[in-house]
Amino acid sequence: MTLIKSISGIRGTIGGGAGEGLNPLDIVKFTSAYATLIRKTCKAQSNKIVVGRDARISGEMVKNVVVGTLMGMGWDVVDIDLASTPTTELAVTMEGACGGIILTASHNPKQWNALKLLNEHGEFLNAEEGNEVLRIAEAEEFDYADVDHLGSYRKDLTYNQKHIDSVLALDLVDVEAIKKANFRVAIDCVNSVGGIILPELLERLGVKHVEKLYCEPTGNFQHNPEPLEKNLGDIMNLMKGGKADVAFVVDPDVDRLAMICENGVMYGEEYTLVTVADYVLKHTPGNTVSNLSSTRALRDVTRKYGMEYSASAVGEVNVVTKMKATNAVIGAAGNGGVIYPASHYGRDALVGIALFLSHLAHEGKKVSELRATYPPYFIAKNRVDLTPEIDVDAILAKVKEIYKNEEINDIDGVKIDFADKWVHLRKSNTEAIIRVYSEASTMEAAEEIGQKIMDVINELAK
């Protein structure tokens, strides 16, 4: 059993004793801490908190515990039940609520679940707020409501429709062009909430031919739910059979978007944003943001339009903060998560799909041909395992000194930008490891520079 508490929420495997896994006792404690914080920080004239969940088997149980706890803390609960992460984020602002709790472990296997915490803007708590939730939970500084001040409960299942309406209302979503293109689309929704909302979105976009794979929201994931090539053999084979022009694959909570070309080849998750950004910048030039571990291709496309690209620390809340600071028109937290402020400040696969199909319809190209128009980059992901007594920060400082003549960014670990490649080193908060991400114009070159830096780290660790 596993239970992980961090500034971004609490996640774990279902079952076990107190503190061993994600069980009702820990859920009550953490929900109470969040409810206490929001009571202090919310500036909205509201007593509502929204709760939404993905289709995990444990979702109903976890939701019932969360809802009861919030009501016990005096909050009025709006239960939108089976809903994507971006749907829940939008529901918070549409309801004028003080916050929201999303019950999803994202791309983790079915035995996992988690509580992700939102503020009154439908955005994730920042590090300071997350730490305060952890402190309150540890100190058990809770004050439950008396019998005359218990919260109320309301179920509202209209938010999937409202989410789709908001996507179709975006200026750059060209429904008529998509209809005329007569696209054939395949989807893999890993038997979670994407299976509820994506078919409806595509129908509303005028896509008449949809091949549906794993769209029953049972929570029994038919493959590892992380949308990586090694997990997507079924839909890739379907595409190789010529069944569709493009395939869209989402994770269980529908904030990540991966795509597959008409020939069965992965489009590349990093290029989801690059392509959508190209379309957005063409029509509404502006700045862009992604995290330090994301492809350089976004920078290249942004500069093509004479605009400025900025990199943030890893983590959606950091990307959003940087986007607001730079007035960015589009951004991403990596892994195919498109953040489009014209809709809302959160990763949203529905927005990504609608903008991508609009772009594809305007370009009149095959998906593989469109992909070939962007700069070719390849990212290698590795790690260096160290012993617990080693000072990881000291090693990173030495690496920074060794490469001081290169362009260095140290807002989140150490990123070394060479002329034609980069390496990003990040320490883990929970393990004695350094994650090593590297990018170059070929996978061989990316692996080579990554290995070179790993050799330096291992030498420094002796």
Task: Indicate residue ranges for each PLM-predicted region.
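Phosphate-binding and adjacent anionic-ligand microenvironments
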Residues: 244, 284-462
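Gly/Ser/Thr-enriched, mixed-charge loops and adjacent short helices
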Residues: 13, 113-240
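An N-terminal, well-structured beta->alpha segment
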Residues: 1-68, 72-73, 152-184
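N-terminal small/polar loop signature for handling phosphorylated ligands or for N-terminal nucleophile
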Residues: 36, 48-112, 200-260
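Proline/glycine-rich low-complexity loops and linkers
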Residues: 131-165, 169, 261-334, 339
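Short glycine-centered, acidic/aromatic-flanked micro-motifs in structured strand/loop junctions
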Residues: 52-54, 187-189, 261, 342, ...
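Short beta-strand-to-turn element immediately C-terminal to the catalytic PLP-Schiff-base lysine
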Residues: 117-120, 258-262, 339-341
